[in-house]
Amino acid sequence: MGGVKKMVKNKKILYLPIILTLSIGFIFPISAHAKTYKKDDQIVIKNPAYTKEFQERERKIKRKAQEIKEKNTTYKLKTYARQGDKDFTDLIPDTATSIIFTDETKPNNEDVIDVDDNGDGGVVAWLEDSGKVMKVSTQKKGQKIEISNCMYLFSGKKNLESIDLTMLDTKDATEMDGMFEGCENLKTIDLSPLNTDSVENMSGMFEKCKSLTELDVSYLNTSKVTNMFTMFSECEGLKSLDVSGFDTSKVEDMTYMFSSCKSLSELDLSSFDTSNVTDMSGLVSYCSALKSINLSGFNTEKVETMESLFEGCKNLETIDISSFNTKNVADMYSMFSGCEKLKKLDLSNIDFQKVTDDSDMFESCDSLAELKVGSTFKQNSDCYLLLDVAYTWKNSKGEELPYSTYKFPENVADTYTKVPIRQTNAE
Protein backbone atom coordinates (compact mmCIF):
# COMPACT_ATOMS: atom_id res chain seq x y z
CA MET A 1 0.00 0.00 0.00
CA GLY A 2 2.87 2.28 0.86
CA GLY A 3 4.43 1.45 -2.52
CA VAL A 4 1.35 2.61 -4.34
CA LYS A 5 1.33 5.87 -2.41
CA LYS A 6 5.00 6.36 -3.17
CA MET A 7 4.47 5.64 -6.85
CA VAL A 8 1.59 8.13 -7.03
CA LYS A 9 3.64 10.70 -5.21
CA ASN A 10 6.79 10.33 -7.28
CA LYS A 11 5.54 9.49 -10.76
CA LYS A 12 3.79 11.70 -13.29
CA ILE A 13 0.65 9.66 -13.83
CA LEU A 14 -2.50 10.85 -15.61
CA TYR A 15 -5.39 10.49 -13.19
CA LEU A 16 -8.21 10.05 -15.70
CA PRO A 17 -7.12 6.67 -17.06
CA ILE A 18 -6.56 5.41 -13.49
CA ILE A 19 -9.99 6.59 -12.37
CA LEU A 20 -11.54 5.07 -15.47
CA THR A 21 -9.77 1.77 -14.84
CA LEU A 22 -10.72 1.69 -11.15
CA SER A 23 -14.29 2.61 -11.98
CA ILE A 24 -14.47 -0.15 -14.53
CA GLY A 25 -13.01 -2.55 -12.02
CA PHE A 26 -15.70 -1.80 -9.49
CA ILE A 27 -18.69 -1.48 -11.82
CA PHE A 28 -17.85 -3.96 -14.55
CA PRO A 29 -15.12 -6.63 -14.29
CA ILE A 30 -12.48 -5.99 -16.90
CA SER A 31 -12.94 -8.29 -19.86
CA ALA A 32 -10.38 -11.04 -20.30
CA HIS A 33 -9.93 -9.79 -23.82
CA ALA A 34 -9.01 -6.30 -22.67
CA LYS A 35 -5.27 -5.83 -22.48
CA THR A 36 -3.51 -3.02 -20.64
CA TYR A 37 0.06 -1.80 -20.61
CA LYS A 38 2.07 1.15 -19.38
CA LYS A 39 3.33 3.81 -21.69
CA ASP A 40 5.22 6.73 -20.26
CA ASP A 41 3.86 5.80 -16.83
CA GLN A 42 0.26 5.89 -18.17
CA ILE A 43 -2.14 2.95 -18.06
CA VAL A 44 -3.50 2.34 -21.56
CA ILE A 45 -6.40 0.08 -22.54
CA LYS A 46 -5.24 -1.64 -25.69
CA ASN A 47 -8.45 -3.43 -26.73
CA PRO A 48 -10.83 -0.80 -28.23
CA ALA A 49 -13.73 -3.25 -28.04
CA TYR A 50 -13.65 -2.83 -24.30
CA THR A 51 -14.18 0.94 -24.41
CA LYS A 52 -17.15 0.48 -26.76
CA GLU A 53 -18.62 -2.08 -24.39
CA PHE A 54 -18.17 0.28 -21.47
CA GLN A 55 -19.74 3.20 -23.32
CA GLU A 56 -22.72 1.09 -24.33
CA ARG A 57 -23.26 -0.07 -20.75
CA GLU A 58 -22.94 3.51 -19.57
CA ARG A 59 -25.62 4.57 -22.04
CA LYS A 60 -27.88 1.79 -20.82
CA ILE A 61 -27.42 2.90 -17.23
CA LYS A 62 -28.31 6.47 -18.15
CA ARG A 63 -31.36 5.33 -20.08
CA LYS A 64 -32.46 3.19 -17.15
CA ALA A 65 -32.02 6.10 -14.76
CA GLN A 66 -34.08 8.31 -17.07
CA GLU A 67 -36.79 5.65 -17.29
CA ILE A 68 -36.92 5.42 -13.50
CA LYS A 69 -37.14 9.20 -13.26
CA GLU A 70 -39.95 9.34 -15.81
CA LYS A 71 -41.76 6.47 -14.11
CA ASN A 72 -41.73 8.34 -10.82
CA THR A 73 -42.68 11.66 -12.40
CA THR A 74 -46.34 12.61 -12.12
CA TYR A 75 -48.14 14.77 -14.65
CA LYS A 76 -50.76 16.19 -12.36
CA LEU A 77 -51.98 19.78 -12.33
CA LYS A 78 -52.18 21.54 -8.99
CA THR A 79 -55.68 22.52 -7.94
CA TYR A 80 -56.09 23.51 -4.32
CA ALA A 81 -53.31 25.66 -2.94
CA ARG A 82 -50.86 24.16 -0.55
CA GLN A 83 -50.00 26.30 2.44
CA GLY A 84 -48.20 29.41 1.26
CA ASP A 85 -48.76 28.46 -2.37
CA LYS A 86 -51.18 29.36 -5.16
CA ASP A 87 -53.54 27.07 -7.01
CA PHE A 88 -53.81 26.88 -10.80
CA THR A 89 -56.65 29.39 -11.01
CA ASP A 90 -54.59 32.01 -9.18
CA LEU A 91 -51.71 31.48 -11.60
CA ILE A 92 -53.77 32.40 -14.66
CA PRO A 93 -52.83 36.03 -15.37
CA ASP A 94 -55.49 38.62 -16.17
CA THR A 95 -53.75 39.22 -19.51
CA ALA A 96 -54.54 35.70 -20.72
CA THR A 97 -57.31 35.42 -23.31
CA SER A 98 -56.49 31.84 -24.24
CA ILE A 99 -55.39 28.71 -22.37
CA ILE A 100 -54.03 25.71 -24.24
CA PHE A 101 -53.34 22.33 -22.64
CA THR A 102 -50.67 20.73 -24.78
CA ASP A 103 -47.71 18.33 -24.85
CA GLU A 104 -45.28 20.65 -26.61
CA THR A 105 -41.90 21.63 -25.21
CA LYS A 106 -41.51 24.97 -23.49
CA PRO A 107 -39.31 27.41 -25.43
CA ASN A 108 -36.03 28.11 -23.65
CA ASN A 109 -36.64 31.85 -23.62
CA GLU A 110 -39.93 31.62 -21.71
CA ASP A 111 -40.17 31.66 -17.92
CA VAL A 112 -41.61 28.63 -16.16
CA ILE A 113 -44.84 28.96 -14.20
CA ASP A 114 -45.02 26.34 -11.47
CA VAL A 115 -48.35 24.57 -11.97
CA ASP A 116 -47.21 21.07 -11.01
CA ASP A 117 -49.07 19.30 -8.23
CA ASN A 118 -46.09 17.95 -6.31
CA GLY A 119 -43.24 20.04 -7.63
CA ASP A 120 -41.47 17.32 -9.63
CA GLY A 121 -41.68 19.32 -12.85
CA GLY A 122 -44.03 16.95 -14.61
CA VAL A 123 -46.29 19.84 -15.62
CA VAL A 124 -45.10 23.31 -16.58
CA ALA A 125 -46.76 26.43 -17.94
CA TRP A 126 -45.55 29.52 -19.73
CA LEU A 127 -46.89 32.62 -21.47
CA GLU A 128 -46.71 33.58 -25.12
CA ASP A 129 -47.92 36.46 -27.29
CA SER A 130 -47.22 39.11 -24.67
CA GLY A 131 -49.05 37.18 -21.99
CA LYS A 132 -52.24 36.62 -23.99
CA VAL A 133 -51.70 32.89 -24.42
CA MET A 134 -51.02 30.54 -21.52
CA LYS A 135 -49.78 27.07 -22.40
CA VAL A 136 -49.75 24.15 -19.98
CA SER A 137 -47.75 21.07 -20.89
CA THR A 138 -46.17 17.79 -19.77
CA GLN A 139 -43.51 18.32 -22.46
CA LYS A 140 -43.86 14.63 -23.24
CA LYS A 141 -45.40 13.58 -26.53
CA GLY A 142 -48.88 12.17 -26.03
CA GLN A 143 -48.82 12.56 -22.25
CA LYS A 144 -51.93 14.33 -20.98
CA ILE A 145 -52.11 16.56 -17.92
CA GLU A 146 -53.94 14.78 -15.12
CA ILE A 147 -56.34 16.48 -12.77
CA SER A 148 -58.51 15.00 -10.04
CA ASN A 149 -60.57 18.06 -9.13
CA CYS A 150 -61.85 20.64 -11.61
CA MET A 151 -63.74 22.72 -9.06
CA TYR A 152 -63.50 26.44 -9.99
CA LEU A 153 -60.59 25.63 -12.34
CA PHE A 154 -61.12 28.72 -14.52
CA SER A 155 -63.53 30.54 -12.22
CA GLY A 156 -63.67 34.32 -12.47
CA LYS A 157 -61.27 34.59 -15.40
CA LYS A 158 -63.32 37.22 -17.20
CA ASN A 159 -60.85 37.83 -20.03
CA LEU A 160 -60.61 34.24 -21.26
CA GLU A 161 -62.06 33.88 -24.75
CA SER A 162 -61.00 30.31 -25.57
CA ILE A 163 -59.84 27.21 -23.72
CA ASP A 164 -58.29 24.19 -25.46
CA LEU A 165 -58.83 21.11 -23.28
CA THR A 166 -57.30 18.62 -25.74
CA MET A 167 -54.50 17.44 -23.45
CA LEU A 168 -56.36 17.61 -20.13
CA ASP A 169 -57.16 14.24 -18.56
CA THR A 170 -60.21 14.46 -16.28
CA LYS A 171 -61.03 10.77 -15.91
CA ASP A 172 -60.48 10.89 -12.13
CA ALA A 173 -62.33 14.16 -11.54
CA THR A 174 -65.46 13.97 -9.39
CA GLU A 175 -66.02 17.73 -9.02
CA MET A 176 -66.62 20.19 -11.85
CA ASP A 177 -68.71 22.70 -9.94
CA GLY A 178 -67.91 26.26 -10.96
CA MET A 179 -65.36 25.01 -13.50
CA PHE A 180 -66.02 27.83 -16.01
CA GLU A 181 -68.07 30.06 -13.70
CA GLY A 182 -67.64 33.76 -14.40
CA CYS A 183 -65.77 33.32 -17.71
CA GLU A 184 -67.83 36.19 -19.06
CA ASN A 185 -65.95 36.59 -22.36
CA LEU A 186 -65.59 32.91 -23.19
CA LYS A 187 -66.80 32.67 -26.78
CA THR A 188 -66.06 29.06 -27.62
CA ILE A 189 -65.31 25.84 -25.75
CA ASP A 190 -64.92 22.31 -27.12
CA LEU A 191 -66.02 19.90 -24.39
CA SER A 192 -65.28 16.71 -26.35
CA PRO A 193 -61.94 16.05 -24.57
CA LEU A 194 -63.60 16.07 -21.14
CA ASN A 195 -64.08 12.70 -19.46
CA THR A 196 -66.91 13.16 -16.98
CA ASP A 197 -67.57 9.50 -16.19
CA SER A 198 -66.80 10.02 -12.49
CA VAL A 199 -68.21 13.53 -12.03
CA GLU A 200 -70.85 13.93 -9.30
CA ASN A 201 -71.14 17.72 -9.07
CA MET A 202 -71.72 20.08 -12.01
CA SER A 203 -73.31 22.93 -10.08
CA GLY A 204 -72.47 26.33 -11.55
CA MET A 205 -70.29 24.69 -14.18
CA PHE A 206 -71.07 27.29 -16.89
CA GLU A 207 -72.64 29.95 -14.68
CA LYS A 208 -72.21 33.51 -15.99
CA CYS A 209 -70.59 32.42 -19.26
CA LYS A 210 -72.43 35.36 -20.76
CA SER A 211 -70.72 35.42 -24.17
CA LEU A 212 -71.33 31.80 -25.15
CA THR A 213 -73.88 31.73 -27.97
CA GLU A 214 -73.73 27.96 -28.46
CA LEU A 215 -72.59 25.06 -26.34
CA ASP A 216 -72.40 21.39 -27.31
CA VAL A 217 -72.88 19.37 -24.12
CA SER A 218 -73.53 16.05 -25.88
CA TYR A 219 -70.11 14.76 -24.82
CA LEU A 220 -70.85 15.09 -21.11
CA ASN A 221 -71.60 11.89 -19.22
CA THR A 222 -73.91 12.94 -16.40
CA SER A 223 -74.87 9.48 -15.14
CA LYS A 224 -73.29 10.05 -11.71
CA VAL A 225 -74.16 13.72 -11.28
CA THR A 226 -76.34 14.57 -8.27
CA ASN A 227 -76.09 18.38 -8.33
CA MET A 228 -76.91 20.66 -11.29
CA PHE A 229 -77.61 23.78 -9.25
CA THR A 230 -77.17 26.92 -11.47
CA MET A 231 -75.36 24.80 -14.08
CA PHE A 232 -76.23 27.16 -16.97
CA SER A 233 -77.46 30.12 -14.94
CA GLU A 234 -76.87 33.54 -16.53
CA CYS A 235 -75.64 32.12 -19.83
CA GLU A 236 -77.32 35.14 -21.33
CA GLY A 237 -76.02 34.68 -24.88
CA LEU A 238 -77.05 31.04 -25.39
CA LYS A 239 -79.55 30.94 -28.24
CA SER A 240 -80.12 27.18 -28.11
CA LEU A 241 -79.20 24.31 -25.82
CA ASP A 242 -79.69 20.60 -26.47
CA VAL A 243 -79.68 18.61 -23.23
CA SER A 244 -81.56 15.62 -24.60
CA GLY A 245 -78.56 13.37 -23.95
CA PHE A 246 -78.36 14.16 -20.24
CA ASP A 247 -78.79 11.29 -17.80
CA THR A 248 -80.35 13.03 -14.80
CA SER A 249 -81.50 9.92 -12.96
CA LYS A 250 -79.34 10.71 -9.92
CA VAL A 251 -79.79 14.48 -9.86
CA GLU A 252 -81.35 15.82 -6.66
CA ASP A 253 -80.89 19.57 -7.10
CA MET A 254 -81.90 21.48 -10.24
CA THR A 255 -82.26 24.83 -8.51
CA TYR A 256 -81.90 27.76 -10.97
CA MET A 257 -80.33 25.38 -13.49
CA PHE A 258 -81.28 27.51 -16.53
CA SER A 259 -82.10 30.74 -14.71
CA SER A 260 -81.53 33.96 -16.68
CA CYS A 261 -80.70 32.22 -19.95
CA LYS A 262 -82.23 35.29 -21.53
CA SER A 263 -81.69 34.37 -25.19
CA LEU A 264 -83.19 30.87 -25.12
CA SER A 265 -86.47 30.85 -27.02
CA GLU A 266 -87.23 27.16 -26.53
CA LEU A 267 -86.14 24.41 -24.18
CA ASP A 268 -86.95 20.72 -24.40
CA LEU A 269 -86.51 18.94 -21.06
CA SER A 270 -88.87 16.06 -21.86
CA SER A 271 -86.04 13.50 -21.66
CA PHE A 272 -85.09 14.48 -18.10
CA ASP A 273 -85.46 11.84 -15.41
CA THR A 274 -86.40 13.93 -12.39
CA SER A 275 -87.45 11.07 -10.13
CA ASN A 276 -84.84 11.99 -7.49
CA VAL A 277 -85.07 15.77 -7.70
CA THR A 278 -86.18 17.47 -4.48
CA ASP A 279 -85.65 21.12 -5.40
CA MET A 280 -86.69 22.83 -8.64
CA SER A 281 -86.63 26.41 -7.39
CA GLY A 282 -86.14 28.86 -10.25
CA LEU A 283 -85.40 26.12 -12.76
CA VAL A 284 -86.12 28.35 -15.78
CA SER A 285 -86.71 31.63 -13.96
CA TYR A 286 -86.05 34.83 -15.89
CA CYS A 287 -85.63 33.04 -19.20
CA SER A 288 -87.25 36.13 -20.62
CA ALA A 289 -87.15 35.05 -24.30
CA LEU A 290 -88.55 31.59 -23.64
CA LYS A 291 -91.66 30.91 -25.73
CA SER A 292 -91.80 27.13 -25.55
CA ILE A 293 -90.83 24.61 -22.86
CA ASN A 294 -91.43 20.85 -22.81
CA LEU A 295 -91.64 19.27 -19.36
CA SER A 296 -93.78 16.30 -20.37
CA GLY A 297 -91.47 13.66 -18.91
CA PHE A 298 -91.11 15.23 -15.48
CA ASN A 299 -91.60 13.04 -12.42
CA THR A 300 -91.94 15.41 -9.48
CA GLU A 301 -92.96 13.01 -6.73
CA LYS A 302 -89.98 13.89 -4.54
CA VAL A 303 -89.96 17.63 -5.22
CA GLU A 304 -90.53 19.78 -2.14
CA THR A 305 -89.82 23.24 -3.54
CA MET A 306 -91.05 24.86 -6.75
CA GLU A 307 -90.41 28.42 -5.68
CA SER A 308 -90.02 30.81 -8.64
CA LEU A 309 -90.02 27.87 -11.05
CA PHE A 310 -91.25 29.96 -14.01
CA GLU A 311 -90.79 33.43 -12.54
CA GLY A 312 -89.89 36.11 -15.05
CA CYS A 313 -90.69 34.00 -18.13
CA LYS A 314 -92.50 36.94 -19.62
CA ASN A 315 -92.88 35.50 -23.14
CA LEU A 316 -94.37 32.13 -22.21
CA GLU A 317 -97.96 31.92 -23.41
CA THR A 318 -98.63 28.32 -22.37
CA ILE A 319 -97.21 26.02 -19.70
CA ASP A 320 -98.10 22.34 -19.60
CA ILE A 321 -97.45 20.83 -16.18
CA SER A 322 -100.01 18.04 -16.45
CA SER A 323 -97.30 15.47 -15.63
CA PHE A 324 -96.48 17.13 -12.30
CA ASN A 325 -97.11 15.32 -9.02
CA THR A 326 -96.97 17.90 -6.25
CA LYS A 327 -98.04 15.80 -3.28
CA ASN A 328 -94.83 16.69 -1.40
CA VAL A 329 -94.46 20.31 -2.50
CA ALA A 330 -94.60 22.86 0.31
CA ASP A 331 -93.27 25.98 -1.42
CA MET A 332 -94.83 27.54 -4.54
CA TYR A 333 -93.80 31.10 -3.81
CA SER A 334 -93.73 33.22 -7.02
CA MET A 335 -94.06 30.07 -9.09
CA PHE A 336 -95.59 31.87 -12.11
CA SER A 337 -94.77 35.43 -11.12
CA GLY A 338 -93.93 37.69 -14.05
CA CYS A 339 -95.36 35.37 -16.72
CA GLU A 340 -96.86 38.40 -18.41
CA LYS A 341 -98.12 36.68 -21.60
CA LEU A 342 -99.49 33.52 -20.01
CA LYS A 343 -103.13 33.30 -21.13
CA LYS A 344 -104.29 29.93 -19.81
CA LEU A 345 -103.14 27.73 -16.96
CA ASP A 346 -104.32 24.26 -16.04
CA LEU A 347 -103.59 23.36 -12.41
CA SER A 348 -106.28 20.71 -12.14
CA ASN A 349 -103.75 17.97 -11.40
CA ILE A 350 -101.75 20.04 -8.91
CA ASP A 351 -102.02 18.88 -5.31
CA PHE A 352 -102.02 21.85 -2.91
CA GLN A 353 -102.50 19.90 0.31
CA LYS A 354 -98.96 20.41 1.62
CA VAL A 355 -98.40 23.88 0.18
CA THR A 356 -97.65 26.40 2.93
CA ASP A 357 -96.33 29.29 0.85
CA ASP A 358 -98.14 30.33 -2.32
CA SER A 359 -97.62 34.07 -1.96
CA ASP A 360 -97.10 36.02 -5.19
CA MET A 361 -97.78 32.83 -7.10
CA PHE A 362 -99.55 34.70 -9.95
CA GLU A 363 -98.04 38.16 -9.52
CA SER A 364 -97.90 40.16 -12.77
CA CYS A 365 -99.69 37.42 -14.73
CA ASP A 366 -101.70 40.22 -16.31
CA SER A 367 -102.73 38.30 -19.44
CA LEU A 368 -103.99 35.22 -17.59
CA ALA A 369 -107.67 34.90 -18.48
CA GLU A 370 -108.41 31.26 -17.71
CA LEU A 371 -107.47 29.22 -14.65
CA LYS A 372 -108.41 25.60 -14.15
CA VAL A 373 -107.96 24.15 -10.66
CA GLY A 374 -108.52 20.83 -8.89
CA SER A 375 -110.28 19.82 -5.70
CA THR A 376 -107.27 20.51 -3.45
CA PHE A 377 -106.72 24.06 -4.69
CA LYS A 378 -106.39 26.57 -1.88
CA GLN A 379 -104.50 29.77 -1.14
CA ASN A 380 -102.70 30.86 1.96
CA SER A 381 -102.47 34.50 0.92
CA ASP A 382 -104.43 36.98 -1.19
CA CYS A 383 -104.37 36.14 -4.88
CA TYR A 384 -102.90 38.76 -7.20
CA LEU A 385 -105.35 37.79 -9.94
CA LEU A 386 -108.26 39.03 -7.85
CA LEU A 387 -106.76 42.39 -6.94
CA ASP A 388 -107.35 44.05 -10.33
CA VAL A 389 -110.43 46.25 -9.92
CA ALA A 390 -110.94 46.44 -13.70
CA TYR A 391 -111.78 42.72 -13.92
CA THR A 392 -113.80 40.09 -12.19
CA TRP A 393 -113.74 36.28 -12.41
CA LYS A 394 -116.55 33.88 -13.22
CA ASN A 395 -116.76 30.18 -12.48
CA SER A 396 -117.84 27.54 -15.01
CA LYS A 397 -121.48 28.26 -14.16
CA GLY A 398 -121.08 31.92 -15.06
CA GLU A 399 -121.24 33.02 -11.45
CA GLU A 400 -119.07 35.97 -10.48
CA LEU A 401 -116.78 35.77 -7.51
CA PRO A 402 -117.71 38.32 -4.84
CA TYR A 403 -116.00 41.65 -5.47
CA SER A 404 -114.43 41.71 -2.02
CA THR A 405 -113.00 38.21 -2.39
CA TYR A 406 -109.25 38.05 -2.76
CA LYS A 407 -109.09 34.27 -2.89
CA PHE A 408 -110.60 31.65 -5.14
CA PRO A 409 -112.90 29.14 -3.43
CA GLU A 410 -110.98 26.45 -1.59
CA ASN A 411 -111.15 22.75 -2.40
CA VAL A 412 -113.43 23.28 -5.37
CA ALA A 413 -112.53 21.91 -8.78
CA ASP A 414 -113.54 24.47 -11.38
CA THR A 415 -112.51 26.61 -14.33
CA TYR A 416 -112.43 30.38 -13.85
CA THR A 417 -112.41 33.02 -16.56
CA LYS A 418 -111.57 36.70 -16.33
CA VAL A 419 -113.92 39.31 -17.71
CA PRO A 420 -113.85 43.12 -17.63
CA ILE A 421 -116.02 44.85 -15.05
CA ARG A 422 -117.71 46.98 -17.75
CA GLN A 423 -118.93 43.82 -19.48
CA THR A 424 -120.64 42.59 -16.34
CA ASN A 425 -122.27 46.00 -15.78
CA ALA A 426 -123.66 46.01 -19.30
CA GLU A 427 -125.27 42.65 -18.70
Predicted regions, residues:
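Short, Lys/Arg-enriched N-terminal segments with co-localized hydrophobic residues
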Residues: 1-6
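Negatively charged
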Residues: 30-427
